[in-house]
Amino acid sequence: MLQTTSLSAMRIFEAAARLGSFRAAAEELNLSPSAVSHAIMRLERDLGVALFERTTRSVSLTVAGQTLLNHASNAFEELRRGVEQISSNKAQLLRLHCAPSFAAQVLSPRLPQFLKENPGIEVRVAASTNYARFVDGLFDADIVYGEPLNREDLIVIPLSEEIVLPLCAPDLAHQIKSPRDLFHQPLIRSDLKRIQWIDWFEANDLGPPPSPSMSFDRSFLAVDAAVNGLGIALESDVLARRELESGKLVRPLHRICRDNRYIGHYLAYPKSGSQRRLARAFADWLTRECQPASTGSE
């Protein structure tokens, strides 16, 4: 049966099934809609099973069609990887998806060391607040903010514990001697942070906090605002590690207040797949890199 099924027919089927439209598949493959329709009918005849349910306005996959799509998608992805590997001088390609602030503050500064330790690997990074869809075959690993909910087919590794605490520029720190001094300082809010100022004030028995003087939708922007002396940021010591180590930021209430701790970021990658070994090597390296480091700035 497989010998009578052409690769081109399978490619047409995969495009139509993935896009949910014969016309869209025709546009993608630069074919006419009738050519797509006839190719799929021939494929159904050769296989002896209906792959699509057709109405006057739409098509949808049958159970058999969905099963074939799952296998066809994996097969074409593996074929693409093989062509990419033999047509490139680079040995391997690692495609990462990452939470934006972690990408900017943690991953990007450390990638040169990873590439130095792993010559012949090319790394591509895409950043967004969404989770990577591994089923599409677009990414090999994902660094996410917050524990992944759908982890049945994933290996999920918690990265280091993060301490969320007030951070500010050294010049501003001289005005802060106790937690109550924060009532009189401009507070910087990170909109997507799971731990907010209200949580920190409550942990320190201070009551409701004053309204923030500014807010940002990314932690790396809040960190940068604090570096520039715009106020006090409630941020992760992991995301602000470079700034703490360089002295651009300090912890004005270190050891005299209660801070919030949690696992903020996780690394996830599929349990199976041709890139599993490379993803595992990256996970091992990143886990080592995220180990806590002491800072001299307080």
Curated annotation (Swiss-Prot):
It comes from the Bacteria. It comes from Sinorhizobium fredii (strain NBRC 101917 / NGR234). Belongs to the LysR transcriptional regulatory family. InterPro entries: LysR_subst-bd, Tscrpt_reg_HTH_LysR, WH-like_DNA-bd_sf, WH_DNA-bd_sf. Residues 5-62 form the HTH lysR-type domain. Keywords: DNA-binding, Plasmid, Transcription, Transcription regulation. This is Uncharacterized HTH-type transcriptional regulator y4mQ. Pfam families: HTH_1 (PF00126), LysR_substrate (PF03466). GO terms for biological process: DNA-templated transcription. PANTHER family: HTH-TYPE TRANSCRIPTIONAL REGULATOR, HTH-TYPE TRANSCRIPTIONAL REGULATOR PERR. One of its GO terms (molecular function) is DNA-binding transcription factor activity. SUPFAM superfamilies: Periplasmic binding protein-like II, Winged helix' DNA-binding domain. Residues 22-42 bind DNA.
